[in-house]
Amino acid sequence: MAGFVPLLLLLLPAGPTWGSKEKCLTKMYTTSGECCKACNLGEGVVQPCGVNQTVCEPCLDSVTYSDTVSATEPCKPCTQCVGLHSMSAPCVESDDAVCRCAYGYFQDELSGSCKECSICEVGFGLMFPCRDSQDTVCEECPEGTFSDEANFVDPCLPCTICEENEVMVKECTATSDAECRDLHPRWTTHTPSLAGSDSPEPITRDPFNTEGMATTLADIVTTVMGSSQPVVSRGTADNLIPVYCSILAAVVVGLVAYIAFKRWNSCKQNKQGANNRPVNQTPSPEGEKLHSDSGISVDSQSLHDQQPPNQSTQGPAPKGDGSLYASLPPSKQEEVEKLLSSSAEETWRQLAGELGYKEDLIDCFTREESPARALLADWSAKETATLDALLVALRKIQRGDIAESLYSESTATSPV
């Protein structure tokens, strides 16, 4: 028995046993009898096994991939999505890129190419969308739905249902929606059930006569005799809000235009008053005639010649005689205007304030070529435009020199 065991060992074959071969998944062996190693997912074979063991290397992201465990397969190149194909999943080490047809196209299973999605015509709506390898599936719009556009994305839409305060002017069809409009000028209210009545009956009421009146009521309340609960029927007054806003805007614009027109008209009248007055009028060579309140005309040049040579032009402060400023000769009025305008400070503005003018009207004079002339032209048209008033105003603004110039040559009395 002891000699039988060595004999049995000699009869066993050399190399790997049958049990070890059954455990070799690749079913490939090296020359030395070793089971060949397989490359995992994301790896490719660089050198297959033979004398040596299998050599693997990782695949390059977005360039190559390997989606199998193999002892012979190298990394495979990634698929490129071109033309009408777009990439839905990128290429990684263990998976290839996934391409699909672009929006509006589907992939034909027979040819593998992308074809344009079918369109549901008017009156037909989408049942199943167009995507991947499936074309658009359309259905005819059933009753109560419609489709008024031809496309491959919209299903049949439900028809519009008119409200209680609306009336249908066009019925809904498979190709067009229903059309409704408000009940006008009548509306219908329903009375609640009263004792002894079978069912409420609609009561049609005429609207109140609102000619010449603007109403802001949004609800119309009707009460029923024998019932303390009012029945409220919504009207169409909510739609009047844009109308009210438009009216308010028109009123504001009109008010602004009216104010602008009044200011423009005031400035225009002042300008016309200044232009109507003669500017360059000089006395005639024969002498200038002055008219006093007594109606006697005196030659001012002759009176000047008759004055004694030693009489001084300076004297007591001049006093007004109650005559109007408009009675002054044009040359004297022009002299006053020049004195008011030649001052370094705006003397004419101070004078205007003393004569009772407000700032807005004074600003109108500044737009004229000669503000002082426009001021005096406007003031001289008033009944209170006397020399006395002008003298008082000039003294208040410390311009007695202009007051003296008014009477230097303008007043003269004739001997009686």
UniProtKB/Swiss-Prot annotation:
Keywords: Apoptosis, Biological rhythms, Cell membrane, Cell projection, Developmental protein, Differentiation, Disulfide bond, Glycoprotein, Membrane, Neurogenesis, Phosphoprotein, Receptor, Repeat, Signal, Synapse, Transmembrane, Transmembrane helix
Bilayer topology annotation: Single-pass type I membrane protein
Any one Gene Ontology molecular-function term assigned to this protein's record: death receptor activity
Signal peptide (residue range): 1-19
Principal subcellular localisation of the protein: membrane
Biological processes annotated in GO: apoptotic process; cell differentiation; circadian regulation of gene expression; nervous system development; Rho protein signal transduction
Positions of transmembrane segments: 240-261
GO CC annotations, alphabetized: cell surface; dendritic spine; growth cone; perikaryon; plasma membrane
Gene3D superfamilies on file: 6.10.250.1780, Death Domain, Fas, Tumor Necrosis Factor Receptor, subunit A, domain 2
Ranges of the Cytoplasmic topological domain: 262-416
Location within or outside the cell: Cell membrane; Perikaryon; Cell projection, Growth cone; Cell projection, Dendritic spine
Cross-referenced Pfam families: Death, TNFR_16_TM, TNFR_c6
PTM annotation: N- and O-glycosylated. Phosphorylated on serine residues.
TNFR-Cys repeat boundaries on the chain: 23-57, 58-99, 100-138, 140-180
UniProt-annotated stretches for the region Disordered: 270-328
Domain Death: 333-410
Protein name per its UniProtKB record: Tumor necrosis factor receptor superfamily member 16
Species per Swiss-Prot/TrEMBL record: Gallus gallus
Origin organism lineage: Eukaryota, Metazoa, Chordata, Craniata, Vertebrata
